[in-house]
Amino acid sequence: MNISQIESKLVKLIKSLNEETFIYDLLLAYGSKPSLISRLKNGLYNLSKVEGEVSLKKKLFFKKVYNEDLHLSITNIATEIKHDQRFVIVTDYKTLLARDMKMNVTLDIHIKDLPKNYDFFLPWAGMEKAQLQ
């Protein structure tokens, strides 16, 4: 998968944003296999049993947040994660806040700007930012 394909998939994802499938569509946009997504959706690979959370070992921790501050939520989650997730993501579907736990950098954007910030999640596609520079 190349960068232009990722950008194109992100544009489609945002145009037809579905809160129920957002995190799965995001992972698919970066080349995750449909079989992994299927197992994640049905709970086999989801390490979290809390509604609105998706936790995939070494990849991500995702949480829908509506009634609390996104910044406070991501800070609390980042200090408590247990499965070496690379990315912590929280969103209210207006704002997307993500932290790369390996590089210790944060993305804080309007969700509609996700395609412009495609490079943040490139490690999911096997590309580190240093490889692009």
Report each predicted region and the residues it spans.
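Nucleic acid-processing catalytic cores of prokaryotic defense/repair systems
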Residues: 1-133
